[in-house]
Amino acid sequence: MPQLDTSTWLIMILSMILTLFITFQLKVSKHYFPTNPEPKHTPLLKNSAPWEEKWTKIYSPLSLPLQ
């Protein structure tokens, strides 16, 4: 059986990595990135829940009078 020639694998792998790096660099450089991003100002809406309008007293067992 003939031996597999692996002498060119290093050059192929390095050239592939270099090509991928250059390709991704070119793709990323074409994107627009804002220089100073600021958060959007959205109006704060207060959700009205029925339990927020009522006052309820919670009785704990320790605050009850002794019998």
UniProtKB/Swiss-Prot annotation:
Output this protein's name: ATP synthase F(0) complex subunit 8
Its encoding gene is what?
MT-ATP8
Record PTM N6-acetyllysine, positions in chain? 54, 57
Print the keywords alphabetically. Answer: Acetylation, ATP synthesis, CF(0), Hydrogen ion transport, Ion transport, Membrane, Mitochondrion, Transmembrane, Transmembrane helix, Transport
GO cellular component terms listed in the entry, alphabetical order? mitochondrial membrane; proton-transporting ATP synthase complex
Localization in the cell: Mitochondrion membrane
- Give residues where N6-succinyllysine occurs: 54
Q: What species was this sequence derived from?
A: Phoca vitulina
Q: Which InterPro entries match?
A: ATP8_mammal, ATP8_metazoa
Describe its membrane topology. Answer: Single-pass membrane protein
Q: Where are the transmembrane segments?
A: 8-24
Q: How does it assemble?
A: Component of the ATP synthase complex composed at least of ATP5F1A/subunit alpha, ATP5F1B/subunit beta, ATP5MC1/subunit c (homooctomer), MT-ATP6/subunit a, MT-ATP8/subunit 8, ATP5ME/subunit e, ATP5MF/subunit f, ATP5MG/subunit g, ATP5MK/subunit k, ATP5MJ/subunit j, ATP5F1C/subunit gamma, ATP5F1D/subunit delta, ATP5F1E/subunit epsilon, ATP5PF/subunit F6, ATP5PB/subunit b, ATP5PD/subunit d, ATP5PO/subunit OSCP.
Give GO MF terms, alphabetically. Answer: proton transmembrane transporter activity
Which family would the database say this protein is a member of? Belongs to the ATPase protein 8 family.
Q: What does this protein do?
A: Subunit 8, of the mitochondrial membrane ATP synthase complex (F(1)F(0) ATP synthase or Complex V) that produces ATP from ADP in the presence of a proton gradient across the membrane which is generated by electron transport complexes of the respiratory chain. ATP synthase complex consist of a soluble F(1) head domain - the catalytic core - and a membrane F(1) domain - the membrane proton channel. These two domains are linked by a central stalk rotating inside the F(1) region and a stationary peripheral stalk.
- One biological process term in Gene Ontology: proton motive force-driven ATP synthesis
